């Protein structure tokens, strides 16, 4: 029985656990649109299924009830419901309750209570006239029509808002009108003269918290009056050659002056500070005037005027040329905040509370327009970005003003909006070394910067190598690269950067040197120093042993043609031959000429031998005449061995023996003295030539026949005539 009951209850429990009741309506609000409807709204919460909402109302001070029904599938606004006329009357008290129902159940909101007077909302009033009041300055009168759909039994409250035509900021005025007051007008005072205003109006039941919508806007203008005043400023220029100084006067309408204020002209008068009697007056319709004042201080005054009167007098003191102005601004900076350019500064003079700000575009030529504005009781100044040109550099100066004196200005440059530079810097390469180079660049023209240059970045890379970069501040226009590779090509370029980005300049190529100037000078110095030392040593050696140096550089070659052997005759020749033994101790190198393998030397030797042969031939010719009478004749010639070269074998032909290029005269004379007088010239010549065997052994073996000799001079033996006397042969 128990199990049966449990099985029967299980589906019901599951269904109950899976049920999702609708969310409880919250934030109920009701508005009574006068003579139209009562509309209530609420927050439905999250819906998971079809939900129907029912608004239950109790009205007529609790005596009547009705409902307003809506659902999430059919109502355009599923969280709103309205009650319509004629079942809406004022005054009355209502109770409102919202009930939400879906397939899983019903849930109700809290009960809310409403007074219709407190939630009534009327139509907006209609403005039909805005006009100035004759004879009353700076005032306009607004007239409107009371809303038709407004409680007759209730007082209304109003809000009037107004602004100038060129302004976006509204000002508001609140006031109330009695339900019995038929004059629906309001006088708006404290306005600017000759200024056009925009007016709008709204109203509400005095007890209600709901305001009507704003009325349609209407425009009106205040009456014209005399000018409000002027602000005066000056631009001082350098003194001219005659001592007079040009001063440009600038003026504009005083702050707060009407935009439409009419001015017919300006009266200016000025005089030296030390003498008011020297006053000069000028009249102009322009907005500026240039005066040529002396070197002393001056006072300048001016007014503007129109048909209704004159403005208050504006005065300005012009300091003397030699007068020193005070300085109190310590630091100043500019920054961009949202859509404004903000300039801030710090002052060391606490008694200075008025400042004059001056700004103009930084262009190459003198600016045609200069803007200025005064600031009081503050150390900052702001200007809208749209009043300045983007990407243009502006010179901003702040002048401290204390009473009638103007202090030394503090100037900076600023951009209202910065961009990327239009072009990069022009780059050059200087002082190229082995491992170093200097990169120089020029500043970008002002018109191409589009911002304040904050830094420069140098990019450089070797061919096929890794790239490097160096960043320097904007005040540096050159940079030295170090640790480069010797004899390597590089590419380099410089990027100029602003706060908005950077732009690269032109890229250039360069190649490092193989040798530095120092290395070249060092090598040249070493070589030159070595040569200098060698020259010094050579000169010193030459001074110490001049003959030796001369002999080494220019060796003396004997010339047989200049020999004195031709002058040897008779006993002199014999006496010179007797010097043999004393000459034997002389070095062989002093008696002979060493052979040389070069063709030029051989030619010289050949010439010497020929000349010497001619000399001998002449000697034998002279002696033959005197020796014929002693000639034995008839004897057969025999071979005679060279008396001075016993080592030369007999039978050697003349061609096999070498030629000695030099025959000492004393030995030739000795041979001549031992020969018989009757010997034939040919025998004498052969006998005399056999004296050449005095040369060293190696010359005897390696000699070659000389074609210039009549007979071969290489022979080591010669024939003696058989007709020679016996004692002559023996002597030979």
From Swiss-Prot:
It is a single-pass type I membrane protein. GO terms for molecular function: cytokine binding; cytokine receptor activity; protein kinase binding; transcription coactivator activity. This is Interleukin-31 receptor subunit alpha. Changing residue 708 to F: Abrogates STAT3 activation. Loss of interaction with STAT3. Mild effect on STAT1 activation. No effect on STAT5 activation. Residues 20-519 are extracellular. It holds the Pfam family IL6Ra-bind. Coiled coil: none annotated. It is found in: Cell membrane; Presynaptic cell membrane; Cell projection, Axon. Expressed in CD14- and CD56-positive blood cells. Expressed in macrophages. Expressed in keratinocytes. Expressed in a subset of dorsal root ganglia neurons (at protein level). Expressed at low levels in testis, ovary, brain, prostate, placenta, thymus, bone marrow, trachea and skin. Expressed in bronchial and alveolar epithelial cells and pulmonary fibroblasts. Detected in all of the myelomonocytic lineage. Isoform 6: Expressed at higher levels in lesional skin compared to healthy skin of atopic dermatitis patients. Residues 541-732 are cytoplasmic. Changing residue 639 to F: Abrogates STAT5 activation. Mild effect on STAT1 activation. No effect on STAT3 activation. Associates with OSMR to form the interleukin-31 receptor which activates STAT3 and to a lower extent STAT1 and STAT5. May function in skin immunity. Mediates IL31-induced itch, probably in a manner dependent on cation channels TRPA1 and TRPV1. Positively regulates numbers and cycling status of immature subsets of myeloid progenitor cells in bone marrow in vivo and enhances myeloid progenitor cell survival in vitro. Residues 24-122, 124-225, 223-315, 319-416, 421-515 form the Fibronectin type-III domain. Heterodimer with OSMR. Interacts with JAK1 and STAT3. Induction: Up-regulated in lesional keratinocytes of patients with atopic dermatitis. Up-regulated by IFNG/IFN-gamma. Up-regulated by bacterial lipopolysaccharides (LPS). Up-regulated by triacylated lipoprotein (Pam3Cys). Up-regulated by TGFB1/TGF-beta. One of its GO terms (cellular component) is axon. PANTHER family: INTERLEUKIN-27 RECEPTOR SUBUNIT ALPHA. The keyword Glycoprotein applies. Changing residue 670 to F: No effect on STAT3 and STAT5 activation. Mild effect on STAT1 activation. The chain crosses the membrane at residues 520-540. One of its GO terms (biological process) is homeostatic process.
């Amino acid at each position: 029985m128990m199990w049966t009951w449990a099985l029967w209850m299980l589906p019901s429990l599951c269904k109950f656990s899976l049920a999702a009741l609708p969310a409880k309506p919250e934030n109920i609000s009701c508005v009574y649109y006068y003579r139209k409807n009562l509309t209530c709204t609420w927050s439905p919460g999250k819906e998971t299924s079809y939900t129907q909402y029912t608004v239950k109302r109790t009205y007529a001070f609790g005596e009547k009830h009705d409902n307003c029904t809506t659902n999430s599938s059919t109502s355009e606004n599923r969280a709103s419901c309205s009650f319509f006329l004629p079942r809406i009357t004022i005054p009355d008290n209502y109770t409102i309750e919202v009930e939400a129902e879906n397939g899983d159940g019903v849930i109700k909101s809290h009960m809310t209570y409403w007074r219709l007077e407190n939630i009534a909302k009327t139509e907006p009033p209609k403005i039909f006239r805005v006009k100035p009041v004759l004879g009353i300055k700076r005032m306009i009168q607004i007239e409107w029509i009371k809303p038709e759909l407004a409680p007759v039994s209730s007082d209304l409250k109003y809000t009037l808002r107004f602004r100038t035509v060129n302004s976006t900021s509204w000002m508001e005025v609140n006031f109330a009108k009695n339900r019995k007051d038929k004059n629906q007008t309001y006088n708006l005072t404290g306005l600017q003269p000759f200024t056009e205003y925009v007016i709008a109006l709204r109203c509400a039941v005095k007890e209600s918290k709901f305001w009507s919508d704003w009325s349609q806007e209407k425009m009106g203008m205040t009456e014209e009056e005399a000018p409000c005043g002027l602000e005066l400023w000056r631009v001082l220029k350098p003194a001219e050659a005659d001592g007079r100084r040009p001063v440009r006067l600038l003026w504009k309408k005083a702050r707060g002056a009407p935009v439409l204020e009419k001015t017919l002209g300006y009266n200016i008068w000025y005089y030296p500070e030390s003498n008011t009697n020297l006053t000069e007056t000028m009249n102009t319709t322009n907005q500026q005037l240039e005066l040529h004042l002396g070197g002393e201080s001056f006072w300048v005054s001016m007014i503007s005027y129109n048909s209704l009167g004159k403005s208050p007098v504006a005065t300005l003191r012009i300091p003397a040329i030699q007068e020193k102005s005070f300085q109190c601004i310590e630091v100043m900076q500019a920054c961009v905040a949202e859509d404004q350019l903000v300039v801030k500064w710090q002052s060391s003079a606490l008694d200075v509370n008025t400042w004059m700000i001056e700004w103009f575009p930084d262009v190459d030529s003198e600016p045609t327009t200069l803007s200025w504005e005064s600031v009081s009781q503050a150390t900052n100044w702001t200007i809208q970005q749209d009043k300045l040109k983007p990407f243009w550099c502006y010179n901003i100066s702040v002048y401290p003003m204390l009473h009638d004196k103007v202090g030394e200005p503090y100037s900076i440059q600023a951009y209202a909006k910065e961009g990327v530079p239009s072009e990069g810097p022009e780059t050059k390469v200087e002082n190229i070394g082995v491992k170093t180079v200097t990169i120089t660049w020029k500043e970008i023209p002002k018109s191409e910067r589009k911002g304040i240059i904050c830094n420069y970045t140098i990019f450089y890379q070797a061919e096929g190598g890794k790239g490097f970069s160096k960043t320097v501040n904007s005040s540096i226009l050159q940079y030295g690269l170090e640790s480069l590779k010797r004899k390597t090509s590089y590419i380099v370029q410089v990027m100029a950067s602003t706060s908005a980005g950077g732009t690269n300049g032109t890229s250039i190529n360069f190649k490092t040197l193989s040798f530095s100037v120092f290395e070249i000078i060092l090598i040249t110095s070493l070589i030159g120093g070595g040569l200098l030392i060698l020259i010094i040593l050579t000169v010193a050696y030459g001074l110490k042993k001049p003959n030796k140096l001369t002999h080494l550089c220019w060796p003396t070659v004997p010339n047989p043609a200049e020999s004195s052997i031709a002058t040897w005759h008779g006993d002199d020749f014999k006496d010179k031959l007797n010097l043999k033994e004393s000459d034997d101790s002389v070095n062989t190198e002093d008696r002979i000429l060493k052979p040389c393998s070069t063709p030029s030397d051989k030619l010289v030797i050949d010439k010497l031998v020929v000349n010497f042969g001619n000399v001998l031939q002449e000697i034998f010719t002279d002696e033959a005449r005197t020796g014929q009478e002693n000639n034995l004749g008839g004897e057969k010639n025999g071979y005679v061995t060279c008396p001075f070269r016993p080592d030369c074998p007999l039978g050697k032909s003349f061609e096999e023996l070498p030629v000695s290029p030099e025959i000492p005269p004393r030995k030739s004379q000795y041979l001549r003295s031992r020969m018989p007088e009757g010997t034939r010239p040919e025998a004498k010549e052969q006998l005399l030539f056999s004296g050449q065997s005095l040369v060293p052994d190696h010359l005897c073996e390696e000699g070659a026949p000389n074609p210039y000799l009549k007979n071969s001079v290489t022979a080591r033996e010669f024939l003696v005539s058989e007709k020679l006397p016996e004692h002559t042969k023996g002597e030979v």
